[in-house]
């Protein structure tokens, strides 16, 4: 016996009784010249929704429907069956008088999960259900694996994420979530396109991981013999397009960060960044709150949504609060009274705050930010713009007009979670280089999420970038709120999972 034959034999031993029976049925069909895998195309005339929505027009007329067999009922001379397609399901009525004895017998051998095409007349049963009175049918795909038990579906979260296709088949609400996700993404594009923004594509592989404070994925380009990074943000390339003269640009796509996995974080995630010439962070606030209101109305019919039992009101305007005021409100510490880094470090020590570098290297602004994260972030339930971040943690941002300790930066928070980040973009190349050099020192102190110096971006900035507003939004997190999903994995079709042993 060859190694290949041994492997096949071992695989067969691992099959369940149901799987073996299904393979036996397939072999019998193939022997009879009815191989379902020889079907190349199905001339479906109507979906389940088409038939139901247009019953008065279609009653008594012939249609051809197709879908996955989800249930069978009845014996003897009549069988009822449900076919599921994307919009929903349609009931089939298979009677011996209409299809013949042999065909009815064949239909009864079909397994749940099989794909079937059926032709027949549209009618309504005595129970009032719109159905198809089948005159002919065809098995168009044989399911060799049984679906999870009907009434329990696929409930184990780990299995649901690993076998998303089965999850969608057995849990219709999961399918609805991803249909809504598509609608949300479409509405975001629609809003920006209507405002004159141009959608662009920038590199996913880059020689520099720039535009955000995050740990990147590193790969190697064999032909060029250089290390490259999966992008952590699209910011620097998009700003180069503003330099080029594109006045309103956006990109929606995947970013990658080599960091932890949690209910809020997936290493591969969808984000959108947009940049507008001649605008500032106030304009970005207006865009953010009006875009989300537009999307909510378009997809949910209201600017109010319920998330984990709490009503969230996305009606503009959102609350605005400075980071200093938030720390004063939630931590009881007035940073207007803190005059030095040493005073801030003493507070950090008292509060047991942890930093990725020695405490004596930590600045006043970094302590302020950490205090907000510890005491204020989870308190911002209703949509809120936290504005005016310390300059030390905002290396790509212009300083605040009238107060050079801070920058014109905001982050949007909903239900205690960050959903967006925006700036009045720094366009002074001399100051920008100084900021990058400071970030290089942060990396020396052990902060591997500090920004890298990108000389190509610096060259572009030296060519001249007009005053610009920029906004980045975590699409997955926004979708969580609009679909009432508690985990980011619930809104990503195939989330990152640890391989099974």
UniProtKB/Swiss-Prot annotation:
It comes from Clostridium perfringens (strain ATCC 13124 / DSM 756 / JCM 1290 / NCIMB 6125 / NCTC 8237 / Type A). The keyword Transport does not apply. The keyword Hydrolase does not apply. Its cofactor is Mg(2+). This is Lysine--tRNA ligase. Mg(2+) 1 binds at residues 411, 418. It comes from the Bacteria. Homodimer. Binds 3 Mg(2+) ions per subunit. GO terms for molecular function: ATP binding; catalytic activity, acting on a protein; lysine-tRNA ligase activity; magnesium ion binding; transferase activity; tRNA binding. It catalyses: tRNA(Lys) + L-lysine + ATP = L-lysyl-tRNA(Lys) + AMP + diphosphate. Disulfide bonds: none annotated. Belongs to the class-II aminoacyl-tRNA synthetase family.
